[in-house]
C-alpha cells in the first residue's frame, strides 16, 4: 500500500504526528482469536492489509483485481458509439491539468472550466465515462453600462470573495421577464457567461445581495447542460467521434472519452441496458453490547453483498467476515483479521465490481453512514476514490439543521457515478404498515417469513467460532436477498428515471431533492423556448405578499350525522392543475404592472378576490399560461402512455410505461405546491391563493346549483330518464360536505341502483353547466349508509358491501388490535344489522329526556353488550397481550423531542437501560400499558406505564385494564358519535352513562372473602 498514515483518535493526541512506516489500527473481536471470548481488541499493525479467500492470501491494494469477479473481454471501440447514461456530475478542471487533456479541449479549461461527466454503459455492456467540454454557466442581470459591469466583474474576480479565476464574457441580450405579464423586453439586460460554474454562482449571489436585478443565478450547471442542449439525464446517446482518454484517466471505469457538447446526439429509445446492482447489509459488534455507534469502540463483523442486475437476475453472493467462517453454499467468503481490512476490502470490491446501483435496507441512516464514519474518522482513510471517479465523492450528507435536530429523513447520499436506493425509505413512503422493519415488509409485500436471529444472539453466535459466524453470515445474506426481491418488486429505479428525464435533472436529484427542484427546470425549459427568463429570489414581484394568508379549499362544514340514505361522492379530476389550465393562471399572466394592461378590455382579464387582496391574470386570448401549457403537455402525454399500456403485451414495457405515467401524474400535482411555498426557487402566493379561491368558488357554485336547480324529482326524470318507480317517497337532495376536491351529496327516497346508473351523468351535467374545460367533476362512489363524523373522517358502505374507513381508529396505526376489533364489531352492527340501523336512526333523533324516560332503542343494546363483553375480557384477563400492543413512530432522536414524557420514548429509554436492541429513527416503537406496581398514586400517565411487549410477556406483567377500556370508549365514541342524540352532554360521557355499572375485584379480595 502507498505510504498512508492512519489516525486513531483513541491512541493519538496529535493528528499531525508522522510515522516513518505505514501503519493501520487493527480493531477486532477477541472471540475470533479465542472462541467465546467477549470484548474487542485494538493494536497498531505495520504490515500490509490483507484478505484470505479460498485458503489463499491476497494483499489489498487499490489497483488489485478482485479474485472472484470475472474479467470482461475487451472489445475494440468504433465510431459511431452508442451508449446509455444513467448519472451525471459536474466538475472543474484548471490550467495545471491541461497536459492530460486532448489539445482541442484545452482552451475550455484555461484558467479554469466546467467539465460535465456522464456515466453509463455502451451497447455492448462496457462501463463508460464521458467528459463533456464546452458547457458554460451563465446568468442575466440589469445594469446601466456594459463597461461598468465588466469592471465590476473583474473587480470581483480579483477579490478575496472569489479566490479563483476563469474566462467570462458579457453580451447585451433581448429577453422578457417570466414573472408578470409584460409586452416589453427587459431594459439594459446583459448575459454573463463563465467557464467556471462555482464563480458564476458566487458572483450571481453577490450582485443579487447588492440589489442588482439578477435572473437565473441559481440555475445549476447540470440543469443548464440538459436544457440548453435539449438532452435527457437518462437515455441512449450516440457520439460520432471518439477521443479516448487512455492515460491519466479521471475515472475508474473501463472506457473514458472526451467530447464537446455539440458531439452528443440523443436517441429516441426507451429500453434499458442491464445495469449492475449490489444489495448489501452489515452486522456490527459493540464492546458494551449497546447499539453500535460508529465513532465509539465497535467493529463491523460481517458485510454481505448480493450482486444482481437491474432486472433482478442474481449473479453472485459475497460475504466479508472477521475471522474464519464455515463454508456457505453458493457464497464467496472473504476472511479478515481486523475491521479496517474488512472495510478496505469492501470498498475495493465496490470499485472492482463498479455497480451502477447500490441498495439495502436503512443503509442511508445506518449502514452507509456507519461505513463512511469508520473509514474517515477512525481510520483517517479517504474513500471517494472507490466511486466511479478517482477523485470522486463517497459520502453521507446530513444537512446542518438535521444534524442539530437528528432528523434522519433528510439524509442524502452522494457517490460519484453510483445511484443509491434505500428500500427502507422507498417502502416507508409507498405503503402503510404497522412498522417498517425488514421482516414486517417482507411478510407484507413478499409473503415471506424472515429467519430471525435476535439482536442479542448475533454477538454470541459470532464469537462462537466459524460455525457461529456462518449462522450470522446466512442471516446477513438473507437480508440482502430480501432487499433484492423488494427492489425488483417495486421497481423504484424505473420510476425515478422517468421523473429525472421529465424534469431535466439527475436521478440522484429526483431521489433526494424536493418537488421544487423537479418543477423549476421544467419551467426554465419552457420559458427558454419563449425567450423568457426567470428572476432570482430577491427580484421577484412576490415581495410584500409572502405573509398574505389564504384559506384552504374547505368550503362546506360537514353536517355530522348518520345517513341511512344513499350518499353520492363526487370528485374533481386533478382539481388544482385543471383550475390553473382553465383560468390561465401563471407567473407570465399575472398582472403586476398596470401599465402593461392598458388598452386591454375588461373581458381579457380574470380578477380573483382573495380576502382583502385582489389578483389579476390576463386570459388565454392575450397570452397563454406557460404553466397551463406545461400541464396540458404532461396530462396529454399521460393519456397517451395509458393508452399504450392498454395495448402493450410486454410485461416489462408495460411496467416501464406505468412508471412513466406515474411520474407525469406526480409532477402535475406538484406544480401548485411549488407556487405556494414562499421559500421555493420561484414562489408566487398570488397563483396559489387564486387556485384555492377559485376552488372554493367552484364548490360553492355546485352547492348553489344543487339547491336551486336539482331539488325536485321532476328534474331527474326530465334530465336523466328516471321514472316515478325509481322514487319511494318524497324526494330530497342535500350537499352534506364539501372538502378540497370532493362533494358528498345525499339523496332521499331514490332507488340506489337507479342512482348509481345516473351518477356519472349527474357529474357530467354539473361539469358542462358550471365549469370551464378542462375542469371535470366525476362520480367516485356511493356510500349507503354513511356515518359522517367530522372533517376528513367518515365510514360508509359501498354497493359491493365493502366498508370504507377514513380517519377512524380502525385504520390508525397507533391503535392496538383489540381496540380495532371492538370498534369493527360495533361498526359492523351499524352497517349490517337492520335492527341496529333503525335504532341508530331513532336514537340520533331522540332527546336526552326521552332516553331517561324510555331508555335507548332496543337495537342499541347489541352495541352495549359488545362494550360490556370487551370490558369483561380486559378486567378478567382474557385478552392476549399481543393484541394490546400500541405503537408510535420514533421520528427523531430522543434528545430532539421537546416533550420527553411520551410512552414510546419511555420504552426506548427502558430498552437502552437493559441494553436491548434499539429502534431506528423512523421505526414504530411497540409498547403496552401495564398495571402500576405502586398503589399510592391515584392516576398514572401512559409514559409511566408503557413497557416493551416482549419484556412484559417474558416477565408475566399484568396489563392496565382501565387504560385500555378508556381507549375503547374513546375510539367507539369517535366512530359512532353521529348516532348519539344532540345534547350538551359530552359524547363519551353519554356512552358511558348507558352502560351498566360493574365492579371488578382483585383475586386477593376473593381469597379474603373465602377466609371470612
Swiss-Prot record:
Transmembrane segments: none
GO biological process annotation, one example: viral DNA genome replication
EC number assigned by the record: 2.7.7.7
Gene3D superfamilies: DNA polymerase family B, C-terminal domain, DNA Polymerase, chain B, domain 1, Helix hairpin bin, Palm domain of DNA polymerase, Ribonuclease H-like superfamily/Ribonuclease H
GO terms, molecular function: DNA binding; DNA-directed DNA polymerase activity; nucleotide binding
Coiled coil: none
EC primary class: transferase
Catalytic activities: DNA(n) + a 2'-deoxyribonucleoside 5'-triphosphate = DNA(n+1) + diphosphate
Subcellular location(s) of the protein: Host nucleus
Keywords recorded for this protein, A-Z: DNA replication, DNA-binding, DNA-directed DNA polymerase, Host nucleus, Nucleotidyltransferase, Transferase, Viral DNA replication
GO CC annotation, single: host cell nucleus
Entry keyword DNA-binding: yes
The family this protein is said to belong to: Belongs to the DNA polymerase type-B family.
Entries under PANTHER family matching the protein: DNA POLYMERASE CATALYTIC SUBUNIT, DNA POLYMERASE DELTA CATALYTIC SUBUNIT
This protein's name: DNA polymerase catalytic subunit
Species: Human herpesvirus 7 (strain JI)
Amino acid at each position: 500500500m502507498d505510504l498512508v498514515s492512519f489516525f486513531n483518535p483513541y491512541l493519538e493526541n496529535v493528528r499531525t504526528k508522522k510515522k516513518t512506516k505505514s501503519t493501520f489500527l487493527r480493531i477486532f473481536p477477541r472471540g475470533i482469536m479465542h472462541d467465546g471470548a467477549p470484548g474487542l481488541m485494538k493494536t497498531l499493525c505495520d504490515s500490509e492489509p490483507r484478505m484470505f479467500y479460498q485458503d489463499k492470501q491476497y494483499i489489498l491494494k487499490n489497483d488489485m483485481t478482485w479474485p472472484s469477479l470475472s474479467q470482461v473481454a475487451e472489445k475494440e471501440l468504433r465510431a459511431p458509439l452508442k451508449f446509455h447514461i444513467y448519472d451525471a456530475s459536474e466538475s472543474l478542471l484548471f490550467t495545471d491539468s491541461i497536459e492530460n487533456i486532448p489539445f482541442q479541449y484545452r482552451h475550455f479549461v484555461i484558467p479554469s472550466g466546467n467539465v460535465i461527466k456522464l456515466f453509463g454503459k455502451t451497447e455492448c455492456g462496457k462501463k463508460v465515462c464521458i467528459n463533456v467540454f464546452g458547457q458554460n454557466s451563465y446568468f442575466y442581470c440589469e445594469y446601466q453600462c456594459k463597461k461598468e459591469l465588466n469592471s465590476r466583474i473583474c473587480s470581483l474576480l480579483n477579490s478575496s470573495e472569489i479566490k479563483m479565476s476563469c474566462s467570462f464574457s458579457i453580451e447585451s441580450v433581448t429577453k422578457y421577464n417570466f414573472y408578470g405579464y409584460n409586452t416589453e423586453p427587459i431594459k439594459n439586460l446583459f448575459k454573463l457567461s463563465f467557464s467556471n460554474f462555482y464563480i458564476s454562482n458566487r458572483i450571481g449571489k453577490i450582485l443579487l445581495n447588492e440589489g442588482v436585478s439578477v435572473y437565473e443565478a441559481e440555475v445549476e450547471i447540470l440543469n443548464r447542460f440538459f436544457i440548453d442542449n435539449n438532452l435527457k439525464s437518462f437515455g441512449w446517446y450516440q457520439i460520432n467521434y471518439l477521443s479516448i482518454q487512455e492515460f491519466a484517466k479521471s475515472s475508474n471505469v473501463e472506457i473514458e472519452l472526451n467530447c464537446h457538447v455539440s458531439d452528443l446526439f440523443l436517441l429516441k429509445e426507451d429500453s434499458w441496458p442491464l445495469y449492475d446492482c449490489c444489495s448489501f447489509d452489515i452486522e456490527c459488534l459493540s464492546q458494551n453490547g449497546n447499539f453500535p455507534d460508529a465513532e465509539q469502540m465497535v467493529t463491523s463483523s460481517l458485510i454481505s453483498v448480493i450482486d444482481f442486475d437491474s432486472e433482478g437476475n442474481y449473479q453472485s453472493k459475497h460475504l466479508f467476515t472477521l475471522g474464519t467462517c464455515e463454508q456457505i453454499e453458493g457464497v464467496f467468503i472473504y476472511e479478515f483479521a481486523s475491521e479496517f481490512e474488512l472495510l478496505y476490502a469492501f470498498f475495493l470490491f465496490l470499485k472492482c465490481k463498479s455497480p451502477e446501483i447500490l441498495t439495502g435496507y436503512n443503509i442511508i441512516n445506518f449502514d452507509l453512514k456507519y461505513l463512511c464514519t469508520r473509514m474517515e474518522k477512525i481510520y483517517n482513510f479517504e474513500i471517494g476514490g472507490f466511486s466511479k471517479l478517482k477523485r470522486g465523492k463517497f459520502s453521507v450528507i446530513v444537512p446542518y439543521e438535521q444534524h442539530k435536530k437528528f432528523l434522519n429523513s433528510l439524509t442524502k447520499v452522494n457517490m460519484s457515478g453510483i445511484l443509491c436506493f434505500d428500500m427502507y425509505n422507498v417502502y416507508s413512503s409507498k405503503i402503510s404498515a404497522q412498522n417498517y422493519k425488514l421482516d414486517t415488509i417482507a411478510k407484507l409485500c413478499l409473503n415471506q417469513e424472515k429467519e430471525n436471529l435476535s439482536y442479542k444472539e448475533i454477538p454470541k453466535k459470532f464469537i462462537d467460532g466459524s460455525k457461529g459466524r456462518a449462522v450470522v453470515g446466512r442471516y446477513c445474506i438473507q437480508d440482502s436477498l430480501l432487499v433484492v426481491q423488494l427492489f425488483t418488486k417495486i421497481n423504484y429505479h424505473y420510476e425515478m428515471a422517468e421523473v429525472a428525464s421529465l424534469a431535466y435533472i439527475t436521478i440522484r436529484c429526483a431521489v433526494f431533492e424536493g418537488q421544487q427542484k423537479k418543477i423549476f427546470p421544467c419551467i426554465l425549459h419552457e420559458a427558454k423556448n419563449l425567450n423568457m427568463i426567470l428572476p432570482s429570489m430577491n427580484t421577484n414581484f412576490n415581495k410584500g405578499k409572502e405573509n398574505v394568508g389564504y384559506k384552504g379549499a374547505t368550503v362546506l362544514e360537514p353536517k355530522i350525522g348518520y345517513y341511512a340514505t344513499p350518499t353520492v361522492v363526487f370528485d374533481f379530476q386533478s382539481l388544482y392543475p385543471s383550475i390553473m389550465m382553465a383560468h390561465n393562471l401563471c407567473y407570465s399572466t399575472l398582472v403586476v404592472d398596470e401599465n402593461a394592461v392598458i388598452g386591454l378590455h375588461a373581458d381579457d382579464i380574470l380578477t380573483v378576490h382573495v380576502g382583502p387582496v385582489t389578483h389579476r391574470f390576463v386570459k388565454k386570448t392575450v397570452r397563454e399560461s406557460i404553466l397551463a401549457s406545461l400541464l396540458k403537455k404532461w396530462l396529454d402525454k399521460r393519456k397517451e402512455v395509458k393508452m399504450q399500456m392498454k395495448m402493450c403485451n410486454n410485461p416489462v414495457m408495460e411496467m416501464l410505461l406505468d412508471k412513466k405515467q406515474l411520474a407525469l401524474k406526480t409532477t402535475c400535482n406538484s406544480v401548485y405546491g411549488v407556487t405556494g411555498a414562499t421559500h421555493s426557487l420561484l414562489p408566487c402566493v398570488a397563483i396559489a391563493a387564486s387556485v384555492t379561491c377559485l376552488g372554493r368558488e367552484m364548490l360553492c357554485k355546485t352547492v348553489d346549483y344543487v339547491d336551486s336547480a336539482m331539488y325536485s324529482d321532476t328534474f331527474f326524470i326530465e334530465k336523466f330518464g328516471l321514472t316515478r318507480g325509481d322514487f319511494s317517497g318524497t324526494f330530497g337532495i342535500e350537499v352534506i360536505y364539501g372538502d378540497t376536491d370532493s362533494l358528498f351529496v345525499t339523496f332521499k327516497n331514490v332507488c340506489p341502483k337507479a342512482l348509481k346508473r345516473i351518477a356519472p351523468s349527474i357529474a357530467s351535467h354539473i361539469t358542462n353547466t358550471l365549469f370551464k374545460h378542462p375542469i371535470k367533476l366525476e362520480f367516485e362512489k356511493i356510500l349507503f349508509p354513511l356515518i359522517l363524523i367530522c372533517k376528513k373522517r367518515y365510514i360508509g358502505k359501498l354497493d359491493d358491501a365493502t366498508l370504507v374507513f377514513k380517519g377512524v381508529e380502525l385504520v390508525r396505526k397507533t391503535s392496538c388490535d383489540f381496540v380495532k376489533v371492538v370498534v369493527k364489531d360495533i361498526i359492523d352492527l351499524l352497517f349490517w344489522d337492520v335492527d341496529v340501523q333503525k335504532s341508530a336512526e331513532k336514537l340520533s333523533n331522540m332527546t336526552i329526556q326521552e332516553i331517561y324516560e324510555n331508555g335507548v332503542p332496543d337495537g342499541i343494546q347489541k352495541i352495549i353488550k359488545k362494550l360490556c363483553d370487551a370490558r369483561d375480557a380486559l378486567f378478567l384477563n382474557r385478552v392476549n397481550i399481543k393484541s394490546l400492543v400500541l405503537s408510535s413512530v420514533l421520528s427523531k432522536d430522543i434528545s430532539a423531542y421537546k416533550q420527553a414524557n411520551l410512552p414510546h420514548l419511555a420504552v426506548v429509554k427502558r430498552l437502552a437501560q437493559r441494553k436491548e436492541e434499539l429502534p431506528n429513527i423512523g421505526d414504530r416503537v411497540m409498547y403496552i400499558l401495564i398495571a402500576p406496581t405502586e398503589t399510592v398514586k391515584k392516576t398514572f400517565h401512559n409514559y409511566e406505564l408503557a413497557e416493551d411487549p416482549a419484556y412484559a410477556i417474558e416477565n408475566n406483567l399484568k396489563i392496565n385494564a382501565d387504560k385500555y377500556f378508556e381507549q375503547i370508549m374513546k375510539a367507539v365514541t369517535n366512530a359512532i358519535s353521529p348516532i348519539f342524540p344532540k345534547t350538551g352532554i359530552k359524547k363519551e360521557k353519554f356512552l358511558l352513562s348507558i352502560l351498566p355499572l360493574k365492579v371488578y375485584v382483585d383475586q386477593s379480595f376473593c381469597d379474603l372473602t373465602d377466609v371470612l
